[in-house]
Amino acid sequence: MSTEKINLLDFDRKGMRELFAQELGEKAFRADQVMKWIYHFGVDDFDNMTNINKQLREKLKQKCEIVAPVVSEAQHSSDGTIKWAMRVGDQDVETVYIPEEDRATLCVSSQVGCALECKFCSTAQQGFNRNLKVSEIIGQVWRAAREVGLEKETGRRPITNVVMMGMGEPLLNMKNLIPALEIMLDDLGFGLSKRRVTVSTSGVVSGLDQMTGKIDVALAISLHAPNDKLRSEIMPINDRWDIQDFLASVRRYIASSNANRGKVTVEYVLLDHVNDGTEHAHELAQLMKDTPCKINLIPFNPYPGSPYKKPSNSRIDRFQKTLMQYEHTVTIRKTRGDDIDAACGQLVGDVIDRTKRTAMLKAAKGETIEVKAL
């Protein structure tokens, strides 16, 4: 397939209409028709778009293509979770399907690897190679929807929620993240509710400020420590934007958002005898008193070579109860897919060059910001 062809998965509705007008000489409604075929029916063959005239189909075949990541490996958990390794170029990223009684969530990657070097995250230990294209982000959703299929055919629940919590820091890939989110929300795309699409960030303040007022989705923040000293030890990004800078940016976003209903989800991974003491719980409760939130506790998911351990159930329970004394809403995330290394912090994928982290961060400066070498 010619590399010169235009991948239609790289365009949101506005971009698709512009493409059809400028490159194909076609009206906007034709672009809308093609988007419906791609996202409503999972069609990637122009000949199967039966309400498109033959002349346009031939033009599309000559100039365009519909190419999503392909599944190179699938692992099925005993709890119904599926982890797909999806091939992007000559590398793999990981995408996870998590079915529940009332919904099915897809965890999507935004980068090949991750540059932020959070000490407790398996992905971060693999290095960073590049940002994913729009087609490689939305293509994970497209491919997963095809793999899951219709409920009546496979018995699997269709995807109802998307969380940008896979490999990578989404807000370091703003250029491609925003169009992908637009397609997820668009009625011509996947038509998901803005409350069912969640972006998680480790604290890229400039990226979050760019999102404010631009796109409205649910926000989750990876906090993981109640003070700057500890957070900088386990999350070096805190040396660039400290907790107060981060939370101020969060409050700005929440103030402009309807999707979050005035609250942010705080993610807090519990590391045994590192950040899980009652003193940490008291400190966290005080820290969040001015930021409306719900706190999601995540017991650490071990991976080979990790220096950290999962806390005992008694320590987890004590941490939760301490927070609840302050009338915070506190949940403990149920671990899913840990038998196939698909749980939070376990995604690895296939990263070729572990030396590119700093160079790639500098290259990303033109898209968002420059994070100092961590």
Curated annotation (Swiss-Prot):
Subcellular location, record wording: Cytoplasm
Keyword Magnesium attributed: no
Known catalytic reactions: adenosine(2503) in 23S rRNA + 2 reduced [2Fe-2S]-[ferredoxin] + 2 S-adenosyl-L-methionine = 2-methyladenosine(2503) in 23S rRNA + 5'-deoxyadenosine + L-methionine + 2 oxidized [2Fe-2S]-[ferredoxin] + S-adenosyl-L-homocysteine; adenosine(37) in tRNA + 2 reduced [2Fe-2S]-[ferredoxin] + 2 S-adenosyl-L-methionine = 2-methyladenosine(37) in tRNA + 5'-deoxyadenosine + L-methionine + 2 oxidized [2Fe-2S]-[ferredoxin] + S-adenosyl-L-homocysteine
One of the GO biological process terms: rRNA base methylation
Purpose of the protein: Specifically methylates position 2 of adenine 2503 in 23S rRNA and position 2 of adenine 37 in tRNAs. m2A2503 modification seems to play a crucial role in the proofreading step occurring at the peptidyl transferase center and thus would serve to optimize ribosomal fidelity.
Extra remark: Reaction proceeds by a ping-pong mechanism involving intermediate methylation of a conserved cysteine residue.
Protein name: Dual-specificity RNA methyltransferase RlmN
Organism: Vibrio vulnificus (strain CMCP6)
